[in-house]
Design a protein with these regions (language model features):
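Catalytic or ion-translocation cores adjacent to nucleophile or general acid/base/metal-coordination motifs
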Residues: 61-77, 86, 160, 274-311, ...
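Conserved small/polar residues in nucleotide/adenosyl-binding loops
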Residues: 512-514
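A charged, amphipathic alpha-helical module
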Residues: 4, 116-268
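Short beta-strand elements in bilobed, periplasmic/extracellular small-molecule ligand-binding domains
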Residues: 1-15, 89-94, 157-162
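Alpha/propeptide regions of enzymes that mature by internal proteolysis
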Residues: 2-40, 44, 51, 56-58, ...
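C-terminal structured domain segments
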Residues: 405-495
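C-terminal catalytic subdomain
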Residues: 283-445
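Cofactor- and metal-binding active-site motifs of prokaryotic enzymes
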Residues: 14-127, 140, 271
Length: 514
């Protein structure tokens, strides 16, 4: 599950050969919080009389490929029944014939089962949870408009809305755990090294300087309180009840959230870059933890993309601006050097405005010492320290963020398999998802430095090279960039396009540009 506990499987108290036994099974499953059902049969067992008719479960059937009894015939019959009744179901059928006394699960069937189970468990975990909007729409970004109907009808998620003044109320009235604040602040001061100050030496106009109401030397104190409060709003905190704040202690039953930030907040208060980065990371001052999908600029559709990615992988989702396509010729013109390796066909500059999960540094190591992104429960103390050491925190550019704050600054210095994705909503079609598998690229320092300094070098950079097919949106790297459906995207460690497609089929999300 998302929290790292093993997935629980329950078995029907009886085999199912009639409607009565199907009802007995359903009654039992209803007491066990079952979100998905897998029926397994080596034989014929009466199609629509035994099928799972519960519209709230994700369904699959494995029909045994054998000759003595017609398991495959039942599979075909019940899949036809599911289709007639409008109940989505997954069909599993082994490639090779098995003997009737063979109790093994063929490798191809096992792969389908695991992929189906990952998606089904993700669907189950989303139901009746909430997307918490902190603020509203950032800078006219369409993804920031929370589509409550989409979240309810496709995901089973409730949309919750919290005005930004609620955060200020809690800071002003001290509605947070003071002991946790001291612990978090101490960790931040010891581990979050400050990078360069882009504002140093600038003669900034009065309208900017007077907009910073929190003194620069108090930014980290404000940011620490802010981070604790955001976490409390999403998940609740029983410590608040002990302090007398019973309603605040409940939280919003969140599974995902986002913060508007720009510009109503950031024009006068420290930005949320640290908060967004550490929420989405696989660790904080308490050690390794479950990542929280948390969207910059409250881009709800990118937040949902983060949620889908982390639910099927257990890894930290990284939020990005899909900023620039660099062709090999353009790189050669600007730097005098050629792209090589995975980057040879060109690269896409993924760079968020100051906040990305620190796991995206690629500083965690696999068993061979290569940079990787791990399931959060597999992060070691060394991995965590490596990610911390690979990141510095540059003071926010006051010309962007008048209220100050600190931006997470790193460069993904590893060649890792990743999957980029994005959910969009298209009028007349509905929600669609784009998926691009590829690799992060570790460019030569000279190339990286010259390209990176052409944008904001206080922000986190990942160079992405998608896998190309020579066709359609994947004709070349330029085509991937040109066909991307929004200004934001998400990367997650590993090539998990097949897992995401399986999940999206359960959610009835259309697939484009695969």
């Amino acid at each position: 599950y998302q929290d790292g506990t093993p997935v629980e499987c329950v078995i029907s108290p009886c085999t199912i050969g009639s409607g009565a036994e199907a009802a007995k099974c359903n009654d039992y499953f209803s007491t066990q919080n079952v979100c998905a059902t897998l029926a397994v049969t080596p034989c014929w067992c009466y199609g629509s009389e035994t099928m799972d008719l519960n519209s709230d479960t994700v369904k699959a059937v494995w029909g045994f490929n054998g000759t003595e009894r017609p398991g495959a015939v039942y599979l075909a019959a019940v899949m036809a029944a599911f289709a007639q009744r409008g109940l989505p179901a997954f069909s599993m059928y082994g490639h090779d014939v098995q003997d009737i006394d063979d109790n093994t699960v063929p490798e191809d069937v096992a792969e389908k089962m695991i992929r189906w189970a990952k998606g089904a468990v993700a669907v189950g975990q989303m139901k009746n949870k909430a997307y918490v909007n902190l603020g509203s729409v950032a800078m006219g970004i369409a993804g920031s408009y929370c589509d409550m109907s989409f979240m309810q009808k496709y995901l089973g998620i409730r949309a919750e809305f919290v005005d930004l003044t609620e955060i200020l109320r809690r800071i002003t009235l001290g509605i947070y755990d003071k002991d946790e604040y001291e612990k978090a602040y101490k960790w931040i001061k010891e581990n979050c090294k400050e990078g360069f100050d882009k504002n140093a030496g600038k003669n900034l106009p009065d309208i900017i300087t007077k907009s910073k109401v929190v003194p620069a030397d108090k930014d980290w104190e404000f940011i620490t309180k802010f981070t604790l409060i955001v976490n409390d709003i999403l998940y609740g905190n029983p410590k608040l009840a002990e302090l007398g704040w019973h309603e605040e202690a409940l939280g919003k039953n969140a599974i995902v959230g986002g913060f508007q930030g720009q510009r109503h907040w950031t024009d006068w208060l420290p930005n949320a870059d640290f908060t967004e980065a550490i929420m989405a990371s696989s660790f904080n001052w308490n050690g390794k933890k479950m990542p929280t999908p948390f969207a910059t600029e409250n881009d709800t559709l990118n937040g949902i993309s983060m949620l889908l990615a982390t639910l099927v992988t257990g890894k930290a989702p990284a939020f990005h601006d899909v900023r620039t396509y660099w062709s090999p010729d353009a790189v050669k013109r600007v730097t005098g050097k050629e792209l090589t390796g995975k980057a040879a066909n060109g690269i896409i500059h993924l760079i968020n405005s100051g906040a990305t999960a620190l796991d995206c540094t690629g500083a965690a190591k696999d068993e061979n010492g290569n940079g990787t992104q791990k399931e959060w429960w597999n992060m070691t103390d060394e991995d965590i320290q490596n990610c911390i050491d690979a990141t510095d925190w540059c003071r926010a550019d006051y010309e962007y963020f008048r209220g100050g704050g600190f931006s997470s600054h790193f460069r993904t210095k590893a060649e890792m398999p990743v999957t980029m994705l994005r959910v969009n909503i298209v009028e007349g079609i509905g929600p669609v998802i784009q998926i691009a598998e590829g690799y992060t690229c570790n460019l030569d320092d000279d190339i990286h430095n010259k390209l990176d300094k052409r944008t904001d070098p206080t922000w986190p950079t990942t160079w992405f090279a998608p896998i190309l097919t020579g066709k359609g949106a994947f004709t070349d790297v330029y085509s991937v960039m040109a066909n991307w459906g929004a200004n934001h995207g998400v990367t997650i460690g590993g090539h998990v396009g097949a897992d995401l497609i399986t999940l999206c089929s359960m959610l009835r999300l259309s697939l484009i540009h695969l």
